[in-house]
Curated annotation (Swiss-Prot):
Lineage: Bacteria, Pseudomonadati, Pseudomonadota, Gammaproteobacteria, Pseudomonadales
Name under which the protein is recorded: Triosephosphate isomerase
Coiled-coil blocks: none
Binding residue positions for substrate: 9-11, 173, 211, 232-233
Subcellular location: Cytoplasm
Broadest EC class assigned to this enzyme: isomerase
Active site (record annotation): 95 (electrophile), 167 (proton acceptor)
Organism: Marinobacter nauticus (strain ATCC 700491 / DSM 11845 / VT8) (Marinobacter aquaeolei)
Protein EC: 5.3.1.1
Family: Belongs to the triosephosphate isomerase family.
Assembly behavior: Homodimer.
Length: 252
């Protein structure tokens, strides 16, 4: 069975006080989440140690970004090895904000995926189309190319450490959400692309992101090819985040 994952991406938000309050609350309520659901918090790197400590072993941590280089004179960068040294289990790669604001390309994403996998961590490749691309009927082609390029470096024995997160750019932080049917359709296409790459497509978790909230998570997570969520703003509210983590259908 594929891993069920709910990952909270805090982006550039947080403080020491928030870590204590929010992570502590999530930890205390994590017992009400299904045993087959992995709860991941992805804070700014400076708070990784604190989140891990507050998580008490019940929460996995992840890094929002790592360098495409292994080490060296790259001021301000954090390597995948450093993320592992900090106890991370996951690393986001190619988030749309990295692509749009910092000019990261598919080739940069591929280089980062390679570093993450070499470090023994799980790479979460983020893919998604803009509104203009969707309206031009290019959504599937754009996402397929992002998947193929970003995961072109994955070797046969590394697919168990790959997760894909589909985040339509037009839905991130806008309050707009793809319908469950639309999200399922794209997740199914992503799985077909993975299958075409000779990856074990039915074993790879594909998450949905883009204004996921407690009131729409259940409908999304009920779809057969949606294995969880990459959560933005809602992950900064303990009750809502835990509610999302509880939104998987029972007995599946």
């Amino acid at each position: 069975m594929r891993r069920r994952i709910v990952a909270g991406n805090w982006k550039m938000n947080g403080s020491k006080d928030l870590v204590k309050q929010l992570v502590g609350a999530v930890r205390e309520q994590s017992g009400s989440v299904g045993e087959d659901v992995e709860v991941v918090i992805i804070p700014p790197a400076i708070y990784l140690d604190q989140v891990a400590e507050q998580g008490g072993g019940r929460i996995t941590t992840g890094a929002q970004n790592v360098s495409q280089w292994q080490s060296g004179a790259y001021t301000g960068e954090i390597s995948a090895e450093m993320a592992r040294d900090m106890g991370c289990g996951y690393v986001l790669v190619g988030h749309s904000e990295r692509r749009q604001l910092f000019g990261e390309t598919d080739s940069v994403a591929a280089a980062k995926v390679e570093q993450v996998l070499l470090s023994g961590l799980v790479a979460v490749l983020c893919v998604g189309e803009t509104l203009a691309e969707r309206e031009a009927d290019q959504a599937e082609a754009v996402v397929a190319e992002q998947v193929r390029s970003g995961l072109s470096v994955v070797a046969d024995g590394q697919w168990s450490r790959v997760v894909v997160a589909y985040e339509p750019v037009w839905a991130i932080g806008t309050g707009k959400t793809a319908t469950a049917d639309d999200a399922q359709a794209m997740h199914s296409e992503i799985r077909k692309v993975l299958d075409g790459m000779n990856a074990p497509a039915n074993e790879i978790s594909v998450l949905y992101g883009g204004s996921v909230k407690a009131d729409n998570a259940a409908a999304l997570f009920a779809e057969p090819d949606i294995d969880g969520g990459l959560i933005g703003g809602a992950s900064l509210k303990a009750e809502e985040f835990i509610s999302i983590c509880r939104s998987f259908p029972a007995g599946v």
